[in-house]
Amino acid sequence: SYDSFGDRVTIIVFGASGDLARKKTFPALFGLFREKQLPSTVQIIGYARSHLSDKDFKDYISSHFKGGDDKTKEDFLNLCSYISDPYDTDEGYKKLEARCQEYESKHNVKVPERLFYLALPPSVFHTVCEQVKKNVYPKNEKSRIIIEKPFGRDLETYRELQKQISPLFTEDEVYRIDHYLGKEMVKNLLVLRFGNELFSGIWNNKHITSVQISFKEAFGTEGRGGYFDNIGIIRDVMQNHLLQVLTLLTMERPVSFDPEAVRDEKVKVLKAFDKIDVNDVLLGQYGKSEDGTKPGYLDDSTVKPNSKAVTYAAFRVNIHNERWDGVPIVLRAGKALDEGKAEIRIQFKPVAKGMFKEIQRNELVIRIQPNEAIYLKINSKIPGISTETSLTDLDLTYSTRYSKDFWIPEAYEALIRDCYLGNHSNFVRDDELEVSWKLFTPLLEAVEKEENVKLESYPYGSKGPKELRKYLIDHGYVFNDPGTYQWPLTNTDVK
């Protein structure tokens, strides 16, 4: 059971005039309200430096709302108000406290409940946290604070950030958001693994020969290169999103779904990870598309000339424990590729030849986005007079299996709801970040010493660096023979 908030809560969004708040935070709050997962009695206050009237603020945040009729939108916006003031002076926070107290006294709230959402860059985290604690955080209340990534740039900056925040708030009050943990298929991983004996019994190095977690974006930096140039793909999605997926995929069974039990097991498996071999990493940067219509990374005017920023990376992770020792695990991610997709591929050992001269390997594919799906590639006899086998699949595609009446929350909707309920399961704990930065910092330092970096160029809209296929084969992945597997419909020309 969780320590849930009640019906009279003040939700305060800092950075309310920013892109993140407009595109993610407020649409998520509206989505919860639309689905009656957020009480209609809460108060929502936006706080930012930008000078906006209440009307302009409401027009701004509602531009990305999905679904709901005009009445629902109007009812939600009636809960919202805006305060414009600097982040580093007391004045605005005193206005904020006055507005909170007015709401709480009007509704006779005995124990104030406040949720602070920091949709802000890390450079102002400390200032805002100090001001909140000083001016808007009475001792007798129940409060929670949501912090957005990045949680530092490396181990040193993470520790510095933690040193600033930990004296102000307890770990129980802090909710570090990695939106990948709110994705439906990621939340399904523990049930899939531990709720099915079929998988539970074979989820180990006796049966699995290869694991891949891949993240593909079909677009480049498109004018946002100035931000990406300082981050790179490893810091942007691999140290956080893909690592979170990997820990859920490889952790041991927790004693329960209790948040601390789950997070304890994630930390345990992280501690079994071997150091990443910086000499066994495939790095790339996209160039112009083959037809010349899409610009290369260095053509982005916001990028440093001759930048060595990594837009594609693949590397192997080794886990030294009884379950995973010897299984090659490859994380790979890239921008400006042929499609946008995130998925997990788990390949199993081959069956003994004997009866079969040639037979393909079983493979479990878990598609996180888009269009959530789980399918298991299996061998089956080709229908008709043939005695040949071909690969087919057992397929669970959410859109065809579950009726459209199912509300599948967006990642931010799911996570804000979890925070409201007091459920920490899908948020990142301090010691988890400490271990993950210890793992990734040496890799990042090696990659960012530019003289060491060998970047493979790949065309915008391609599958990635041409060396990728060989890299995957070298790390245990066996590709299907050409023509043996056809998706989604198998034709008579199957080999």
UniProtKB/Swiss-Prot annotation:
Residues the record lists as binding NADP(+) 2: R332, K341, R345, R367, Y375, L376, K377, D395, L396, T397, K463
Protein name (record): Glucose-6-phosphate 1-dehydrogenase
Keyword DNA-binding recorded: no
One Pfam family hit: G6PD_C
Keywords on record: Acetylation, Carbohydrate metabolism, Glucose metabolism, NADP, Oxidoreductase
Residues that coordinate or bind NADP(+) 1: G15, A16, S17, G18, D19, L20, A21, R22, R49, K149
Gene3D superfamilies on file: Dihydrodipicolinate Reductase, domain 2, NAD(P)-binding Rossmann-like Domain
Annotated pathway: Carbohydrate degradation; pentose phosphate pathway; D-ribulose 5-phosphate from D-glucose 6-phosphate (oxidative stage): step 1/3
